[in-house]
Amino acid sequence: MRFVLLLAFAWLFCRVSASAAEPELFESKIRPLLIARCHACHTDTASGGLRLDSRAALLKGGKSGPAIIAGKPDESLLIQAVAHKHATLKMPPAGQLDPQDVLNLATWVKDGAVWPESPREFFLSKVKPVLDANCMGCHGDAARAGLKLDSRESALKGGKSGPALVPGDPQKSLLMQAVRQDHDTLKMPPAGRLSDDTIANLGQWVKDGAIWPEVKGPEVPVYNLRPDQKAFWSFQPIRKPAAPQADRPEWNRNPVDQFIYAKLKEKGLTPGKKADRATLLRRATFDLTGLPATREEIAAFVADQSPDAFERRIDKMLASQQYGERWGRHWLDVVRYADTAGDSADFPVPEMYKYRNYVINSFNKDKPYDQFLREQIAGDLLPAKDDNQRWEHIVATGYITVARRVGVSPTSDRHVTLEDTIGNFGQGMLGLSIGCARCHDHKFDPIPTADYYALYGIFDSTTYPASGEEHNPYRRDMTYRVGKEKAAEILKPFDDAFAPWKKLERKKFDEYQEFQDKKILTPGRSREVVWKELTQVREDLKPFAEAYPPLETAWAASEGKPHDSKIQVYGEPKNTTALVRRGFPLILGGMKVPESETGSGRLELSQWLTDPKNPLPARVIANRIWHYHFGKGIVATTSDFGVRGAAPTHPELLDYLAARFVEDGWSFKKMHKLILLSETYQLASMDIPANSATDPQNNYLWRQNRQRLDAEEITDSIRLLSGTLDLSMGGRHPFPNDRTYFYRQHEPFTGNFESPRRAVYGMQQRIVKNPYLDLFDGPDGNLPMSERRSTTTSLQALYLMNSEFMDHQSALITDKLLAAGKTTPARIEWAYGTIFGRSPRPDEIAQSEAFLKKLPWTSFVHSMLSSNPFLFVD
């Protein structure tokens, strides 16, 4: 009773005074009380939907309504609750407040609930959001110019220009000079000057001592794997099953056949006949080399009836350079290989061919696949026996740096390049769409967003070279074979001579750009005049650019500053939450990069990836090898082994192949032999109506699948037949000197360097597609392609019938045909054997003779090159 009377008396006689409304009451009595008795439940946890850490939060209230009504303590839920006058709300739970504390709260509410900002609150409300929105993109983990603005210590340390802050002195603080834009060179942020109010707030903060309270970050959300997620087939350990016995001897010699035959019997299907020897050799030669078997090779193979004749032919093809060119192209499809960067100006990457050739050579050497993967993820961190191997390992990291650069300023949009890297790593090496977890937990697969950013931190701790960008066209962070320091020493005198020209060129370019932004009224100055001056400067600097010594460089990855990354809310780099330790997907073990590790984590990633206990890499690549031989994988979605992907048609066979692949030293060539020597591979492609009724898609392989030649096979084969194909290995494309790259969004790089070599060596641009490759469903340097679609369009037919290339090649082949035979039947026989890889049937001879009575031999050859027997492999 005494307490209620005291409170009523206080409210009755409390008068509004200047002192009551001053901040002292809040700072001395109210804030400490709220922190001590209320914040445990009513800050981040927001019990009852109520926060009590700001005036706005109190006015907003929680589930029961506003906590206070300024000027009306008797109507305020907060006062009713702490005074225990509310019917249900009695606060705080630990016990009633002292009457004087209740009186202070009531007085404070009566006087308008004044809530002056503390230095901490001022920083959190007025300063930190500005830094996060305008500075952290460049001066967070990226530490542009050596400066980080993620803590007071980092700001005091500063970067290359010196300390960013001088607490108490806004005039001397580089940060303030930069945002006021009264510094000679520092003008920040790059996107435009901040508002006067924002600059004033920053200045006040610095003047008051630059108080920077430590803000505890949010916790990484807990992700609990469900039993059904853990039990999904692709995440299970690889176990090598015993091959089932077949009741037909020819289907009981090869484990591939035993598994296939068992499934055929289960489905009530009968295997078809074996392909004839000419068809079989043509099929295998295209499969392994991407080129047709010659008339002489086919004739010799048909005549050779020894039991090991086909195996010897396989060995010969696997030992040829053409094997690596064919199978290296498959891998280049997966990693979206290109010779340009992909930014708005599509800057060239002259060194990219080294990675391409590394891939081709790796297949030719039958490099173990696990080693192949380790070199591409962390080659620069692996031991090497000599300098040549060290350099080979470094070049291998082109897998990482081939990631696409995006936009006018790729450096500022680095996160998009990292997204491209992670997406390709997931699809290409694990068969998982990890990129779908960038903005939120994966909707179907057990991949939380934290897994995405655990990998993000690894690649964000890696240095990617820059090919140039519109406003800074000079390359950076290249890897020199002689080493960074030695290269700097060698290049210094050339850099010194070139520097004035670089500065002049940028000055002229900036002057030219000004005409886009504002009117220039200086007499005699116009956009055209300045452009002419700019092009002259660029012409004048060429001799200085070309004077540089040709130091060997690679488009390679290297170690950056190791750090963990924060989860980006909806994939927005400027809106981050919890910090995630670098590591690997939870469903595959969830191991973390050790805290003691001083590197990026790429080495640990490469080791985890290729651990035989990891079930995905071997399964994925075994399935892809099968796909390239049969036109369809055991898992039809060759880069998606997740919930939304296709289920395996032969799960036991897939596990057998994966286990066998690892047992055989991760060898591609041994896997080829296992598959090609099977009855399954050697089946004819002819239809069996009874089987088609049950299995129209041939999912269970009762026949071989007929496949169209891909874009490279078509052009390479035609050139080989005409005698114009250069079989030597390709090298660097004839790009201009890299110090003269002045490409921009509206004048991007374009080029199409014609070459007589195989198509795999052709220059592949990202923004401008090769019209021929695009027409015949060729590779896209912007997207991973483990499966190429096979379309049939009228434009393809028009190209085959009317293009200059086809006309010229047909004429060259005709010259060879006319020289090879003196009679019409002999020439027809030569044409069929050379172009179709078989002898003509009697009806085909008659049709050909009738055709030749009306049209010349060139038209005959041209029509054969445009026909299905040439364009398809049975």
Report residues per predicted region.
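Bacterial N-terminal signal peptides
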Residues: 4-15
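Solvent-exposed helix-loop boundary motif
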Residues: 19-106, 110, 114-203, 212-256, ...
